[in-house]
């Protein structure tokens, strides 16, 4: 039977469902740390810089192990690679809850740094290996939507994390001292990863042709004329390192991550300082408003992730222009994101308007996510896991730098300037303004990178020409 004569099955969307579920788990596990940070910071008595190093430990490990875990997926397949790394990071998620401060000792703090680093090591492989699975299961003109859906799911879960954490937290009072209990949240979130691995093991296959329920028409649709490779994978590192496209993609993602990391690191603490917190009673208007404000940038981002993925694929299907199909939405998204940051400077004394502008910035940033990750598949092809790993590696180095630099800038303003008789709150506001200028400027550079990036030029031809 001619495979094109029958209607393709839709088993590939089951892969998308698993990928979306995993994306949600990754965000629950990482965002919950930023959500509880105001309470952890008080319990461990940390400065802004010390808090920043905890965020940086995760981001640096996430960056350092993107390429190795992407290579593992390209070499051994997404099925077994994802099972191993999800179990790894789930263990360290739970272990976070078992570390307690010790008076006069810095050991618990350094142990937290190590655990956050090892947690990031595991999570580093999630999205490169999702990209690997999508390369096997989706034709290139559906990948933008698929990646957008994955990011939508993750951002949505991240946006709901504050609600979940606040609902799970409880208080006790001993000798008149109130204690917020947050540790059990990490045990619960760690368990979700184990459950996901069990179902993934039984359902997923790296080769669509070997999966029950996939017909020949769907296999033909997925392959899309791409030549199958049976040879041993040899990574063309020379071509990768010489690729202008790859360096532009990495530079763009570095700048975007530098600005975006605010949403899962310092923003919850800023809101608490401004009086936007959950209060002592659950399910009140104050509780819901605090959760909404903490998660708003990620919630609106979840919508734009899906929208951006749909738009980039729609543009390519309608025009056949892969270059502008990816570039256009990158330029628009990051340009408007930078604009929101610069405007937010004028609303520092209005926390409600400030958070809405930061949320709009997140919306425009996430409009680019489908195009960015689909571009990894466009130019990487059979090396898509490695290309995605390279992009996310450099991007999270931007996040790591943001964790260190943001905290240092805030501490310098509230320390050095106050020592010179400056008002503490005014000095802290100046520190925030300085950081906002840096975040907005980073997005301007990201726009420049998008203007030079061309997704229609693969690093190595795979027998499938991407038309413009």
Question: What name fits each language-model region?
Answer:
Residues 92, 106-125, 254, 340, ...:
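Hydrophobic core of transmembrane alpha-helices in multi-pass small-molecule transporters
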Residues 144-170, 193, 301-305, 392-403:
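Glycine-rich segments within core transmembrane alpha-helices of 12-TM secondary carriers
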Residues 31, 59-67, 124, 159, ...:
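Residue-level signature of mid-helix packing/kink "hotspots" within the transmembrane helices
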